[in-house]
Amino acid sequence: MSSIKKTLAFSLGTFFSRITGLVRDIILAKTFGASSTLDAYYVSIVFPFFLRRTFAEGAMSSAFMAIYKKLKNKEEKAQFTSAVLTSLGLVTLLIVFLSEVFPYFMASIFATGADEEVKSLAADLIRLTAPFITIVFVWAVFYSVHNASHRYFLPALTPMFSNVGVIVGCLFGDVRWAAAGFTIGGLAALLVLLPFGKFRYRPTFKGLGEFYRLFFGTFMTMAVSQVTTLIDVNVASFLDPGSLSLIQLSSRLYQLPLGIFGVAVSTVALSTLSESEGDFHENLKDFISKSLFLTLPSSIGLMALSERIISLLFGYGAFTHEDVKKSAQILFMYAIGLCFVSLFNLLSRAYHASKEVKTPFFATLLVSAVNISLDVILGFTMGASGIALATSVSYIAGFVFLTLRMKPSFDKKIFKISLASAVMGTVILLLRGSFKGNLGTIFLVLIGVFVYVLFSKLLKIEELEEILRRGSH
């Protein structure tokens, strides 16, 4: 299976998952608006998402894949999988226990500036979402097993179950049901990936030396990067009520193309580069082009249509016109750094694939230092949009750092991708005033896609040709 076919399989699964996530956010915004109630919900899922990112999309998958793919037979793979489940499973169970016993303390860590009402509600919700921590860890292990066997579609699809759980919970009109649905949906996602009848769990701690060496290096990198998320949440908790909700809703939109395209390319790159020998740098150059081909036009499109897109998706029910304007400003700032986040993640995965974890760790330290500093400066001067801008600037700095260290070769086709994206953005801006309302927004998006595909075809950008060729098979 070629890298573009793997990327498309992962992207398709992720697309369905992210679309259900978008529906989830629309329903959350419509039901609760940018309110203290929704703020409390987001506080309750901060830590489970932190662990999902470090395990499923970071330390666990990187360390697990690097070793699992080198093992020769099923017995070795089964023993290694059991050892990881045993050792880290006990750690997650302890975390769940502490979260259930001290939920108010957890809420206070993640939302220092929130009022007592928000913290108390968040504490109640944490008791419902905490079990997700162990669930998502076990899910992440089997997610990695599937990816190691080049099965990308189903694992990428499974996060949709948690989204569906939240959607169903919202139908009851109580945020507690939404939190419960979050955890129940996560359990459903795990059950789908479990290899019933093909894997027998045997408690063991054997053979984890190299895994932990890779895991802790990568985990520290990911943990440092996620500290910025906690700082984002804390700074937002000192701002106007609903600011955290606006940031979360806007960031989910910016993460939509990042998740469908950026994470897809990075995930496939980790698997491919882990097996690379002399063609490592050539493969990396190819993945850089693929990443930019998909994320650069997404970035420009989100900036050009930020308010129109927010209004189309969230401008209903309890979500006010003022909420729309504030969210659009936040989305614009996030979109500035979208392609740089994708490239930073890709270059970090390239280091992990070669079992070198120090450089991405220092790069993440830089990103975190810049982000935290700018969070405080811009967050308290610009408001919620300043927090988003801080994220973009910090990842630009991290990308520059990794580029200077790794010195990857960039394909000349990047100029063509930039030109096609610029033409697309210009056309959207010129036509924006001629297409009114939500239907007009949909037409503008379709026109943008058409223009980008057309100019990619005229400029003979290979990524488009490969996608069209694979899509026809």
Swiss-Prot record:
It is found in: Cell inner membrane. It is a multi-pass membrane protein. It comes from the Bacteria. The chain crosses the membrane at residues 31-51, 90-110, 125-145, 153-173, 177-197, 215-235, 253-273, 300-320, 327-347, 360-380, 382-402, 414-434, 439-459. One of its GO terms (cellular component) is plasma membrane. Keywords: Cell inner membrane, Cell membrane, Cell shape, Cell wall biogenesis/degradation, Membrane, Peptidoglycan synthesis, Transmembrane, Transmembrane helix, Transport. GO terms for biological process: cell wall organization; lipid translocation; lipid-linked peptidoglycan transport; peptidoglycan biosynthetic process; regulation of cell shape. Pfam families: MurJ (PF03023). One of its GO terms (molecular function) is lipid-linked peptidoglycan transporter activity. Pathway: Cell wall biogenesis; peptidoglycan biosynthesis. The keyword Repeat does not apply. The keyword Cell inner membrane applies. Involved in peptidoglycan biosynthesis. Transports lipid-linked peptidoglycan precursors from the inner to the outer leaflet of the cytoplasmic membrane. Belongs to the MurJ/MviN family. HAMAP family: MurJ_MviN. This is Probable lipid II flippase MurJ. The lineage of its organism: Bacteria, Thermotogati, Thermotogota, Thermotogae, Thermotogales.
